[in-house]
Amino acid sequence: MKIVIAGAGEMGSHLAKMLSGNGHDITVIDSDPKLLADVASLADVLTVEGDSTTFAVLRKASVRKCDLFIAVNHVENDNVVAAVLAKQLGAKKSIARIDNNEYLEPNNKEIFINMAIDYLFYPEKVAAQEVINLLGHTSTTEYVDFSSGRLSLVVFRLDPTSSLIGRELSGFKDDAAQLSYRTVAIARGGQTIIARQDEIFMEGDMVYVIARQDAVKEVMEFSGHSNVEINNMMILGGSRIGIRIATELQDEVNIKLIDYNAEKAYRLAELLDKTLIINEDGRHIEAMLEEGLANMDAFIAVTGRSETNILAAMLAKRMGVKKVIAEIENLDYINLAESIGIDTIINKKLVTASNIFRFTMSTDVQAIKCLTGSEAEVLEFIVKPNAPATKAPIKELKLPQDTIIGGVVRGDKVFIAVGNMELSAYDRVVVFAMPASISKIGYFFN
């Protein structure tokens, strides 16, 4: 697939690296030659220097021949203009990053569809929603619903108190004849291990389980964690993510939002009438303690600065806060943050990748989730009539290495996949796979 990316900043360079690694032909546009040099050193891409909102530059990047145009410039208006022009010049699909939730309202969204933009995505909104979902499942590190919640990926770290430590994976399964959950992978020491039945659970393992909705509670009992009711919450950072979280939850939870910028704090106080806004520097330990950090049920660090978020999250964990979530945009810091006990990490690059990746698939992909604690991805496919996957039991399909089918939704029935199961047309199938296998999976469901 030929893909043109407008914007060589952090998000654009991450997408270029990820997509070129999956065998796509990538061209990156940016007006900053240094950013272009940086992205060219990270990935096998072509670069075009110039303004992506001009016809000349878009023509130079051959957008008329591209299958997908992705606008991720820093300026929202530039993304909208570039996406419209690219589609008019011949791009098959055109998508744009936005920073304004107003654009996603149904009436306004229709306008952009009429302008020929295929998809608008707002990473901060998706990241905020992930945080809100996790606050309802505080014992998990990541929690992803598929097929309207009928199947879920449940991720948890094994604490010393977990009864799973020292047991084989084969021993962690539902005893019923029809399984209701199964382990699909373990992340350990920065590596992801696709589930093998003789693998031994170890303390600190990140465990990935596909579960039916009615089995999630049972799965979590094995983790050594328990869900905590969130009544008091502190948000560090009046960023777009922080504002959206407070807006959604301020009627249900007592929220303190801390921001070091006095002018912004005044604006936030007008915007969030049921949230207590505090003008303070979250890096000052004494100030955080005075504001009652130790009494919080949840702490969310979303300042936009990874280092500040990590330090503040470490303090919150030390003070005994039950659920600690930190936004970490530097991908190199993620393993470090997990190793020091931060419960959950959110990353806008991975959120964006999850939104965009499905546009590069030839198969009917309903959802993709790029995981934070693992290089693996989880995908939901719809099986087409006469697809190869319908011709033999799962164990005989010769799926790509490091790929495992976790669950299947068939009409109103939900199954955990086993080797002798045969897939049918229109099944919704949840697949856990490593990046090198992603491009090969679609064949089985087409």
Ranges and model annotations:
Residues M1-N446:
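Cytosolic regulatory regions of ion transport systems
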